[in-house]
Structure formats: structure tokens, C-alpha cells
Amino acid sequence: MQGNEYTLPNGLRIIHEPTLSKVAYCGFAIDAGTRDEAENEQGMAHFVEHLIFKGTEKRKAWHILNRMENVGGDLNAYTNKEETVVYAAFLKEHLERALELLGDIVFHSTFPQHEIEKETEVIIDEIQSYEDTPSELIFDDFEDMIFRNHPLGRNILGKPELLRSFRTCLLYTSPSPRDTERS
């Protein structure tokens, strides 16, 4: 089967690939990963990925997590050097539910301060677990050697001291105009 690609007037690009499966997948791929972070923002993309599930203007965290699970679906996200992706897997009759939920968490997250404080500790635990894994550390050292002094050489999770400095006001700040050409 062949996919179709559309670009909406607001610049949102939609890729649709028909399938015969009863299971559907959809997501938002946000063209902002750790390579787009300034030195003092290391880990911000991954941090935001965690926080978007913690509340929106109309939903509490528990409602976000249960919205797809209640119909047998799954909601998840990941961050890499190039992008942050929020996605869902579900029975195709729940497409509208999935799109509405994904749109809500991507565009209307509230980043409550109490959730920022809790999630900071969750991610610091994740960093400590990561640091106990030699194969992960070797890969980080390898990337650091190749991309020395470039955001691509940094760890996606960030640094505990920077995570502790993140506040709601930083998360709402628009990205500074940076060179759109990726080097």
C-alpha cells in the first residue's frame, strides 16, 4: 500500500498510510530533539516528553493515561536527537479519540509545577539507572568523542543539576530563533 502526504495551511504535515489491519497508529513527530537544545537546556526535550502526560487545560494526568487504555489502546512517547514523538496504538474505530487526545497533550499541556518537581526526580532516577549500564556509557562516550562540543554529543536525558533548574516559565518560553539548517 502507498501512503499519502498532505500539508495543512498551518504547516502541519500529515502522512496517511491505509492498512487492512484493525489496529491503527498515529502520532505527532515534533521536529525538536536534543540537538536543538542550548547548553543550559540539556535534557529539556526529554523532560517535556515526560511532562506532556501530566495535565492539560481540560485533563488531569490520570485521565490522559486512561483515555486510550479504556478502549484497549496504548499511549506513549520518545525523544531522540532529532525529534520528540508522541503516539498512540489503538483499534481503528478509536482514531478520533486518539487524535483528539494527542492534539490536546501536544498543544495544551499545562506543565504543573508540582508535576515538574516529581518528574525531575523520576528522570534523575532514570539517569542513575542509565549510568549503571556500561553499554550505555560506552555509547555516550563514543558520541561525545565524535561530536565533541556539539549537541549531538550530549546525553538525551540531560544532567541532574540542569533538570533541577527547569521551571514552568522555561517550558512555556518559545524556542529562540536558531539556525534552521541542521549541522
Predicted regions and their residues:
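Acidic/histidine-enriched segments that form metal/cofactor-coordinating
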Residues: 57, 64-170
